[in-house]
């Protein structure tokens, strides 16, 4: 359970002070979904910068340069890879065909190890499942709607992720995890967070910095939305059928093959859910019980998010 957050000041209407206030408010509001680590990515001049630490957002001090337009952020609840190894924290740095990008992911991938084997992804000291997405995009050699579609259709588990490239294009890839995007057309600013509740809570403390009406931009499951430096939006889609498919899952690392999702309790996704359960007041035995009753791992994770089983 993590949180994505950020803004895009495509009109250049915000001062440096306002930008720092906005990103701090968004980050602190996002703590409800993770306090183990906090990080942001942004582009200044010709350089893509990433600032991340194994601290809760309220301990972070952001100093954004005045010329920054897009900021992509993440708060983390650790599920795989210690947050004390800062390389495991989001956003991650990648390079596709010589062009840098940053990526932040909310969710749990169940097939990251399988992808590393099948796609022959290089060994890395980064231990998180999320980094497999970075490596797949590096292997694809470009960041665009097509490579994001192909990559997303390879993923299993739960995900929504954001990518900021070297040209200040901000991509939002919505899988089966929540996402909320607001647009202030008069101010020429976009704001986003993983949930509407988090975004509204942040807005309650920064609304004076934003003028005019607000509109919610729909980002549905299977959408790939690109926010461009001039404020325009381009869209693509990918299939999400595989995220709800009950076909057989292969777990080559554990030697288990099953035609029913609830029988893969020895798989990596179920193990991550068991690790996550305690943070929400449940036990690993509860996860086994729900799997035995036919709940999919994705459904259990979503129940964690919304507090209902």
What spans do the regions from the language model cover?
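Conserved short alpha-helical segments that host acidic/polar catalytic motifs at enzyme active sites
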Residues: 1-309
